[in-house]
Every structure is written in structure tokens, then in C-alpha cells.
Amino acid sequence: MAGLKLQAVSKSWDGKTQVIQPLTLDVADGEFIVMVGPSGCGKSTLLRMVAGLERVTSGDIWIDRKRVTEMEPKDRGIAMVFQNYALYPHMSVEENMAWGLKIRGMGKGLIAERVQEAARILELDGLLKRRPRELSGGQRQRVAMGRAIVRDPAVFLFDEPLSNLDAKLRVQMRLELQQLHRRLKTTSLYVTHDQVEAMTLAQRVMVMNKGVAEQIGTPVEVYEKPASRFVASFIGSPAMNLLEGRISDDGGRFELAGGMQLPTNHEHRRHAGRKMTLGIRSEHFILSSQAQGGIPLLMDTLEILGADNLAHGRWGEQKLVVRLPHQQRPTAGSTLWLHLPLEHLHLFDGETGKRA
């Protein structure tokens, strides 16, 4: 196994604007890291720099304790799996998986051994003589992964490999990728815009925004303790409810637009007089009643999801989304009374967006 290290790596196309801000990342031997973020955030560019397909403007890349910053892709000990499979249509599954080893001059016996082992792991044994056009999307993606496995790389690089698959097949392939990593234990760097893939596959998630790593942490950490307003809004479905306002001068209240107020706790009071953003996840609201007090949510729409429901409504000028038990189905125009437990409230700096 081998580790991967990015040391203050940056990228600029014109020498002025940095599309990747200096970024440092240590990936342990056998670790599975997922880079997630919206389109244009720089995640694929960063992956291509690790692969050697893009030049690094500054900084260094280390694989298996070797500096590979200027090395050709073929010499880095990496194998890449792409979104579009990149299979040769005129070759069989077996030939596609073996081709990279063949052009490297590996012996036929060893090639056959590696292809058979990869086919066994990926359950492609009975498909080795077929052409790509005879395979389903999931089978083609397994062939692409098999072609990477036979190389026995130090690091796997995945560039949105499940994007072309339908929803049901994506779920199946996520499970297969988890099982594959548990079996091979190869260091992996995976790019996706899909937060479900990120949260289910990763041992650690790197959330990227405009070329910056906003947060690096376990899936639980980035969900339960987002490092910034951006992470809070990007990770989670639905996104965290974010309310703009300020802490009162005496620190005792959170003052929102429209004259709405919420109590603060002792920790919040150190931010007295400052603009802040308050966040709460949809599942952390507690149903209350008018007699018990709380905040009134005027219902707009209800999304019935099966296991639970999402209530969309307004509290004054604030729009909120609340997750409800499946049997709770308020109608449009009705009022829900809610309690916001202080222990589940998140505070973000109103200027920087960073967690307070």
C-alpha cells in the first residue's frame, strides 16, 4: 500500500487567478478520500494534477513517499477510472483489461493471471469474451475498474465514475465500490458532485468550493459540525436551514429579519453585537404547540417521501424546511408549532461564513 500527499498544491491557468488555492492533504495508506463540490469548484482539476494530466503551478505531490510532481502519468503508480468508461469498442472485455499491461511489455502468463483475478473479484468471469456493446452500463463500469485493478496501482483515482448510471444502478455500484475497497485496501481519491456518494463511500470527505478545501473530515464530522456556511448548505438533503441575523448587544437574543427573535445560550453570548448566520438541520426541530410555546411555521407545501415528510413553510420572513414523521401531514395554510433546541443550533460568522 502507499500514501498520497499534496503539499501546498495550487493551479493557475493565466499566472494570475488561482483556480486551486494552495492545498495540503495527507491521504493515509489504504484510505478512501472523496472530493465533493459543485461544478467548477476545482475537484477534477486537482485529480488531474495528481494523475499528471495537468501541470502543478506550485507545490508538490508525493505518492508512496516519492516526489512525483514532474513525473509522467505512466510513472506515478496510479490507475484512473473515468465517467465515460473509455473502453475500446473493438476489443473484448478480456482484451480491454489486458491492453495496458500488454503495451507495457508484461508477460502473457502474468497478464492472464491478473485479468482472471480481477474478473473474479468483479464477477466478470463469464463476460470476458464479450464486446462493450454487449454489456450493461454497470458491467462496462466494472470492466473499467478491472482495467485499473490489473495494474496493481499505488493509488486509485476515480473521476465521477457513476455519473452515467441510472439511480438504481448507482446504488448497486456504490455498494460494490465499498466492498472492492475493503478487499483491495488501495489508497483511493474519488471525485463526485453527488453528496450521497461522498457520504456513503468516504472515510474522509474533502468539501471544495471555488478552489478551496472548505473542510476535510469524516462524513459524520462534515454533517454534524460543518466548518462553514457553504458546507452547511451543500452537505445534507435538504440543506441546513440558514437564518441571517445578529446577536443582540447584550448577547441574550438572536435577532432575525422582520423582528423575529430566538434565545441564545452562554456560548453564543461572546458574539454579542455581531452579524451571524444561525443554522439548524430539518430533523432537529421538535414539534410543539401554541400552549407550550415555540415558533409558528405557516405551511406552504408538503413533500411526502414515504419514511418521512418534508414541510416547507415560513416563520415571518424566514423560509424553513422541517422533517416530520411519516404520519404527520399538515396541510397548506395550517400552522405548525416548533421548538428549536439550542444544542442543535449552529452559528456562522456573518462576514466570513466560518463556523463561530
Locations of the language-model features?
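ABC ATPase nucleotide-binding domain
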Residues: 5, 26, 62, 337-339
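The feature captures the beta-strand-to-loop junction immediately N-terminal to the Walker
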Residues: 36-38
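Helix-to-loop junction immediately C-terminal to a conserved catalytic motif
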Residues: 51
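Conserved coupling/switch loops of ABC nucleotide-binding domains, chiefly the family-specific signature
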Residues: 57-60, 110, 210, 345
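Conserved ABC transporter NBD signature motif
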Residues: 59-67
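ABC ATPase nucleotide-binding domains
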Residues: 73-230
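Non-catalytic connector elements of ABC transporters
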Residues: 238-241, 249-356
